[in-house]
């Protein structure tokens, strides 16, 4: 087993996750089996109870693990399925050690950070690195480990010490440290500054780790003189200094790394059984990056949510939309709309903000209402849903978005004006959305319906079933506490709101579709968590196809993109327009 540790310096949020994912992608393209581990030094057990504004979105894994959004990057880049134990937190490690102490496993010894916490970290990493993640039973050959935060943070000290010890346990030919640092370029001088990187590497070396590669993040490509200066002061060769400047798309990052000789370096440094160049997999990434930069036609989607001030709150949603847009040769224009800005109270308090929000919504080719919690902003979401339904604008509701779509339909089409969710009104007169029986209201952590679940299609005449390849059932990831009230299903279906997907017991409603509408779909699950750059999520792909007017033609040709539409160089035209012109649009 080979271990690649990715650390960061100067500031957080400079792209360690993308760089770690890109390194894994390059090594996978060389034919190696790769897994990934993310270490978060916070004391929380997991990310499940985080505010989205605190740490971005909560990414859900197949096994129900609620983890850091960087694990989503690993899954998307590497096309693997990770487990909750691939996300290590300080809380998990301390809980593990304390439980062992309570059981008497330490035989009465004084339990300390060194050696007990550091040993627990090393043991966890070694055990989890051996778990297959790509659908095969063979163990991974490479484990990419990202240490969150920055070097010098007090929270991360036990982990740095653990890896200082671990590098000798694993031996030099099996352990490599990549340090990601910022090279700022003040606008006043325009000069690229190396001092922050020098200080960061000095701090890392002072803690017992020496970087094998220094990845410099910068706004523009770093100059050779700057590279040589970093090499001289940081005790590495110039070829060990890698530049990753700001690019238009993250698809370009693996290509930049490969162009700077990283494959040859890893082959020699870790004694890997690979050639000097990558396979066709990396060529596809290069094609995607080239194609993304040449896209000309645009599709505008309005994302109506309550956490729009921080884009990371909807990171997977954005990626799923981007994957789908790229698959049909369109550039995504995602317009974030705070749902509160659509409400009447905002019209009174801030008319300019109110009208700007509605102008965005009216310009959109499609509307998306993602998941969320709480009553704040729900009126604005309901108004956006009503707008999309009544004006036949393509719409996708995810989790809470589906629940609100059912509430809006009940109020305006069934005239059930008191229709509501017990999440917002516990004593609702018409409880359209209700609490699930297994939910324990005592604790918030780990009390939801989480992880991958099977959804069975109840009819063959379903748009979403066709988009999924006309399969009888699908498996997608869930994260919710509430569900549509089964006692109201017959009333809703009489008005053409069909519940085309249910759970295996037929008790929980999973998918809705509205008849006589271009695309009005709601899903209780979160399909964005399973979207991949080369395998877009079907519900999101359907939204983009409908928003560009190509859904019917796509369904007529058997839900297949032509060869010129999937990650090729032919990006001047939109989705298969010559072929679409020959098809009769129903």
Curated annotation (Swiss-Prot):
<feature type="region of interest" description="Disordered">
    <location>
        <begin position="564"/>
        <end position="586"/>
    </location>
</feature>
<dbReference type="InterPro" id="IPR027417">
    <property type="entry name" value="P-loop_NTPase"/>
</dbReference>
<dbReference type="GO" id="GO:0003883">
    <property type="term" value="F:CTP synthase activity"/>
</dbReference>
<dbReference type="Pfam" id="PF06418">
    <property type="entry name" value="CTP_synth_N"/>
</dbReference>
<dbReference type="Pfam" id="PF00117">
    <property type="entry name" value="GATase"/>
</dbReference>
<protein>
    <recommendedName>
        <fullName>CTP synthase 2</fullName>
        <ecNumber>6.3.4.2</ecNumber>
    </recommendedName>
</protein>
<comment type="similarity">
    <text>Belongs to the CTP synthase family.</text>
</comment>
<dbReference type="InterPro" id="IPR004468">
    <property type="entry name" value="CTP_synthase"/>
</dbReference>
<dbReference type="GO" id="GO:0006241">
    <property type="term" value="P:CTP biosynthetic process"/>
</dbReference>
<dbReference type="GO" id="GO:0005737">
    <property type="term" value="C:cytoplasm"/>
</dbReference>
<feature type="modified residue" description="Phosphoserine">
    <location>
        <position position="574"/>
    </location>
</feature>
<feature type="modified residue" description="Phosphoserine">
    <location>
        <position position="568"/>
    </location>
</feature>
<feature type="active site" description="For GATase activity">
    <location>
        <position position="526"/>
    </location>
</feature>
<feature type="domain" description="Glutamine amidotransferase type-1">
    <location>
        <begin position="300"/>
        <end position="554"/>
    </location>
</feature>
<comment type="pathway">
    <text>Pyrimidine metabolism; CTP biosynthesis via de novo pathway; CTP from UDP: step 2/2.</text>
</comment>
<keyword id="KW-0436">Ligase</keyword>
<keyword id="KW-0597">Phosphoprotein</keyword>
<feature type="active site" description="For GATase activity">
    <location>
        <position position="528"/>
    </location>
</feature>
<feature type="active site" description="For GATase activity">
    <location>
        <position position="399"/>
    </location>
</feature>
<dbReference type="InterPro" id="IPR017456">
    <property type="entry name" value="CTP_synthase_N"/>
</dbReference>
<keyword id="KW-0067">ATP-binding</keyword>
<dbReference type="GO" id="GO:0019856">
    <property type="term" value="P:pyrimidine nucleobase biosynthetic process"/>
</dbReference>
<dbReference type="GO" id="GO:0005524">
    <property type="term" value="F:ATP binding"/>
</dbReference>
<dbReference type="GO" id="GO:0097268">
    <property type="term" value="C:cytoophidium"/>
</dbReference>
<keyword id="KW-0315">Glutamine amidotransferase</keyword>
<dbReference type="InterPro" id="IPR029062">
    <property type="entry name" value="Class_I_gatase-like"/>
</dbReference>
<dbReference type="InterPro" id="IPR017926">
    <property type="entry name" value="GATASE"/>
</dbReference>
<dbReference type="GO" id="GO:0042802">
    <property type="term" value="F:identical protein binding"/>
</dbReference>
<dbReference type="InterPro" id="IPR033828">
    <property type="entry name" value="GATase1_CTP_Synthase"/>
</dbReference>
<dbReference type="GO" id="GO:0044210">
    <property type="term" value="P:'de novo' CTP biosynthetic process"/>
</dbReference>
<feature type="modified residue" description="Phosphoserine">
    <location>
        <position position="571"/>
    </location>
</feature>
<keyword id="KW-0547">Nucleotide-binding</keyword>
<keyword id="KW-0665">Pyrimidine biosynthesis</keyword>
<comment type="function">
    <text>Catalyzes the ATP-dependent amination of UTP to CTP with either L-glutamine or ammonia as the source of nitrogen. Constitutes the rate-limiting enzyme in the synthesis of cytosine nucleotides.</text>
</comment>
């Amino acid at each position: 087993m080979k271990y690649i540790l990715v650390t960061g310096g100067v500031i957080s949020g400079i792209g360690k996750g993308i760089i770690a994912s890109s390194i894994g992608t390059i090594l996978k393209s060389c034919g190696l089996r790769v897994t990934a581990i993310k270490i978060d030094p916070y004391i929380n057990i997991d990310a499940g109870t985080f505010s989205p504004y605190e740490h971005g979105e909560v990414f859900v894994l197949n096994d129900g693990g609620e983890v850091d959004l960087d694990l989503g990057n690993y899954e998307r880049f590497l096309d693997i399925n990770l487990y909750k134990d691939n996300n290590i937190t300080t809380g998990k490690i301390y809980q593990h050690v304390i439980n062992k102490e309570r059981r008497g496993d330490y035989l009465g010894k004084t339990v300390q950070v060194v050696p007990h916490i550091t040993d627990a970290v090393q043991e966890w990493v070694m055990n989890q690195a051996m778990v297959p993640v790509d659908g095969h039973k063979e163990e991974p050959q490479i484990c990419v480990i990202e240490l969150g935060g920055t070097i010098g943070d007090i929270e991360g000290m036990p982990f740095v010490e653990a890896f200082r010890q671990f590098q000798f346990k694993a031996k030099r030919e099996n352990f490599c440290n990549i340090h990601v640092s910022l090279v700022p370029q003040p606008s006043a001088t325009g000069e690229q500054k190396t001092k922050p990187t020098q200080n960061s590497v000095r701090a890392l070396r002072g803690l017992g780790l020496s970087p094998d590669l220094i990845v410099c993040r910068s706004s523009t490509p770093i100059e050779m003189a700057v590279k040589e200066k970093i090499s001289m002061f940081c005790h590495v060769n110039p070829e060990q200094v890698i530049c990753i400047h700001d690019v238009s798309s993250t698809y370009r990052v693996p290509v930049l790394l490969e162009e700077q000789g990283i494959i040859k370096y890893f082959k020699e440094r870790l004694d890997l059984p690979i050639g000097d160049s990558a396979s066709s997999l990396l060529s596809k990434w290069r094609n995607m990056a080239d194609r993304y930069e040449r896209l000309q036609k645009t599709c505008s989607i309005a994302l109506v949510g309550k956490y729009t001030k921080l884009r990371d709150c909807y990171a997977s949603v954005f990626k799923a939309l981007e994957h789908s847009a790229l698959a049909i040769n369109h550039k995504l224009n995602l317009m974030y709309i705070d749902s509160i800005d659509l409400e009447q109270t905002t019209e009174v308090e801030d008319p300019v903000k109110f009208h700007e929000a509605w102008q965005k919504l009216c310009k959109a080719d499609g509307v998306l209402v993602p998941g969320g919690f709480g009553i704040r902003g729900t009126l604005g979401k309901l108004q956006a849903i009503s707008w999309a339904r009544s004006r036949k604008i393509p719409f996708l509701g995810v989790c809470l978005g589906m629940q609100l779509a059912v509430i809006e339909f009940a109020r305006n089409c069934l005239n059930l004006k008191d229709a509501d969710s017990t999440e917002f009104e516990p004593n609702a007169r018409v409880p359209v959305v209700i609490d699930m029986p297994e939910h324990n209201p005592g604790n918030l952590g780990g009390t939801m319906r989480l992880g991958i679940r099977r959804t069975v299609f109840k009819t063959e005449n379903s748009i979403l079933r066709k988009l999924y390849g006309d399969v009888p059932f699908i498996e997608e990831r869930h994260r919710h506490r509430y569900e549509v009230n089964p006692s109201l299903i017959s009333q809703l279906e009489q008005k053409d709101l069909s519940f085309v997907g249910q759970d295996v017991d037929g008790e929980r409603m999973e998918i809705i579709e509205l008849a006589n509408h271009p695309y009005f779909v709601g899903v209780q699950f979160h399909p964005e968590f399973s979207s991949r750059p080369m395998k877009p999520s079907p519900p999101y792909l359907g939204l983009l196809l409908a928003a560009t007017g190509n859904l019917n033609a796509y369904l007529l040709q058997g839900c297949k993109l032509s060869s010129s539409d999937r990650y090729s160089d032919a990006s001047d035209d939109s989705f298969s327009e010559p072929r679409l012109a020959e098809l009769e649009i129903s």
